[in-house]
Amino acid sequence: MIIGGSKKDVIKNIEQNVLDNELNKKVEINDASLTDEEISKLLDTFYKNKSKKIRYGIKHALANMTVSKYMKMLDKDIEINGSEKLKNIDLSKGAIITSNHFNPLDTFIIRKLVEKVLKKDLYIVIQDTNLAMSGSLGFLMNYLNVIPVSKSPTYLAGTFKENLRKVLNAGNIVLIYPEEEMWFNYRKIRPLKRGAYQYAAILNVPVISCFTKINDTDILDNEEFNKTTYELNVLGVLYPNGEVSPRVNSINMLNEDYELKKLAYEMAYHKKLEYTFAASDIAGYRWNEI
């Protein structure tokens, strides 16, 4: 399912960023660019809305109904492999899930694992600027189970960490995308950032490592893309080591997760992971017809 109109310029940005070795750089062309003051107001509004229990509860229920509708539409296109690796995991204090980020709706892939297999609630860490989105996607960003992240050190050490702790202590699952930026339908795993693993170490929760393979079909989606299907691969569970610092833990877990995802990519697509650009790196794109 394609959201957001033409992706031609986005794909050009992906190609250029690969050439420049800027593998975590933003590629979307219409993302909000906000000042620190505007972001602070967004976050204040988000938390004030959550405090209005009745009004927020109604909108939260509507957001969940919307998600349920999309889940029914997408369910047949999502296959889950490796869930047996989670059979003995202790989720009493929750867990963090990491995966590759390639579509505004790829959270539905993780949601299927969390809700149908683990029987847990999913919370999603989103960038603060996502709260400024308009339309139905903006509504979902503001009223689903989300935890906005910001570049503010004070916010990260205070509000964000405490909200993350509260959600995890309730036994919920939190999705964090360690690649940070979304690259539309990009197949490859990109370098990971340390935040997800740092918080896993500080809060002493496991990290569930995942990788989604994107499969092409011959079914037309729009004028630029064919439809795609998805294979979510559960790669393993990473645990913090209580004998080393959170920083050392985060580096070790990041490296282990990257190696798992790299191997998963290479096994899924039968090719070595190399950061060059090829047309086949963008799933479903109809290069020869555009």
Where are these regions (language model features)?
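Short amphipathic alpha-helical segments and helix-helix/interface helices
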Residues: 67-68, 111-114, 138, 164, ...
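Membrane-anchoring hydrophobic helices of lipid-metabolizing enzymes
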Residues: 1-96, 101-111, 143, 286-290
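Non-catalytic C-terminal accessory region of glycerolipid acyltransferases
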Residues: 2-34, 160-290
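Structural motif corresponding to alpha-helix initiation and N-cap regions
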Residues: 80-83, 134, 158-161
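A conditional alpha-helix N-cap/helix-loop micro-motif detector
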Residues: 76-79, 153-158, 189-190
